[in-house]
Amino acid sequence: MRIQVNNEIEINYELTGDPKTQPVIALTHGMGGSQANWEADIPQLSEKYAVLRWDVRGHGDSDKPDAPYSAEIHARDLAGLLEALNINQVYCGGNSMGGAITQRFMLDFPHLAKAGFLMCTSSQVNPKMAGAWEQRATIAETEGMEAMTAAQSTFANANT
């Protein structure tokens, strides 16, 4: 489902459960991913939480404006999404780039964050690694997710 946030862009999201009767957990994916990355986690999380997954600006089915992106912009998008959905506070978490966005969100919008969790992330990009991140972003943009999947398949499967 898509919704306009901050009078600026449309964000794609999925909301499982009832945010009026359950605490909400907001999940933010990593670079080149989408809200679908959290699909396997939904059955267990939705037993206790309303689960909000969203496609970060420039990813999945969200708008892809032709402008620079930053953790600050993505954090503002999440705050705008919560406002548009009339959600006052969330537990929030993210992996990789999503973890960096989650940290920025918690710093910039502490009144919206009850608590957070971070996976495989950092608070800043090491200057030596900046080129590698740019390369990953370019591959995702020009060659698509199949190329990203091929590169990531060299890592161990955490579910085995």
Regions found by a protein language model. Give the residues of each.
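Conserved HGGG/HGGXW glycine-rich cap/lid loop of the alpha/beta-hydrolase fold
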Residues: I9-A67
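Hydrophobic alpha-helical packing elements
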Residues: D41, H74-D77, M148
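Conserved alpha/beta-hydrolase "nucleophile elbow" surrounding the catalytic nucleophile
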Residues: H29-M31, V90, G94-G99
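Conserved acidic catalytic loop of the alpha/beta-hydrolase fold
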Residues: E72-V90
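The conserved SAM/SAH-binding core of class I Rossmann-like methyltransferase domains
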Residues: L52-W54, N95, M119
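Flexible "cap/lid" loop of the alpha/beta hydrolase fold
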Residues: A100-D108, L112-E143, A147
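N-terminal cap/lid segment of alpha/beta-hydrolase-fold proteins
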Residues: M1-E10
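Residue in the alpha/beta-hydrolase core beta-strand immediately N-terminal to the catalytic nucleophile
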Residues: D55, Y91, K114-F117
